[in-house]
Amino acid sequence: MKQLLDFLPLVIFFAVYKMYDIYIASGALIAATALQLIVTYALYKKIEKMHLITFVMVTFFGTLTLIFHDDAFIKWKVTVVYALFAIALAVSQLLNKPILKSMLGKELVVADKIWAHVTWYWVSFFVACGLVNIYVAFSLSQETWVNFKVFGLTALTLINTVITVVYLFKNMPEEHKKELNK
């Protein structure tokens, strides 16, 4: 259920964009992201920092898009969010308090060196996606950017998640692998 909620704003943005335009879709994205927070809190009594940061960025850039009637703001939102995620992961790793390990380390027991590899892998991924977003957003058509944002970045994120899980599992001690397979 939680993963479905993560996709709700993206699906609504895409559907509204296809029916109307980028401006109505931006407003719908703001509303859907707010709804996502409300439903998540109602169901789980907790809101993750990532969702809160995304909501603030969607609201900020979406509002600027609507006020100035300029889609450049909503296009920049993607890169800014990825940059913030990359910075947060990098800083947490440099401070020896890796975010990914704190989120997943209880379920996936691996050496700190492996968590560092995973962290830097995701930092690189977020930076690359942010840079590619700039290229697609400002060099190609708006429709191409929307499709890239919805399908391309989602697919890349899912692929990288699978790669990460495989890498973590491969580097997990045998006794922990057996526990997970029970």
From Swiss-Prot:
InterPro entries: YciB (IPR006008). Its main location: membrane. The chain crosses the membrane at residues 22-42, 50-70, 72-92, 118-138, 148-168. The keyword Cell inner membrane applies. Keywords: Cell inner membrane, Cell membrane, Membrane, Transmembrane, Transmembrane helix. GO terms for cellular component: plasma membrane. It is a multi-pass membrane protein. It is found in: Cell inner membrane. Belongs to the YciB family. Plays a role in cell envelope biogenesis, maintenance of cell envelope integrity and membrane homeostasis. This is Inner membrane-spanning protein YciB. It comes from Shewanella woodyi (strain ATCC 51908 / MS32). The lineage of its organism: Bacteria, Pseudomonadati, Pseudomonadota, Gammaproteobacteria, Alteromonadales.
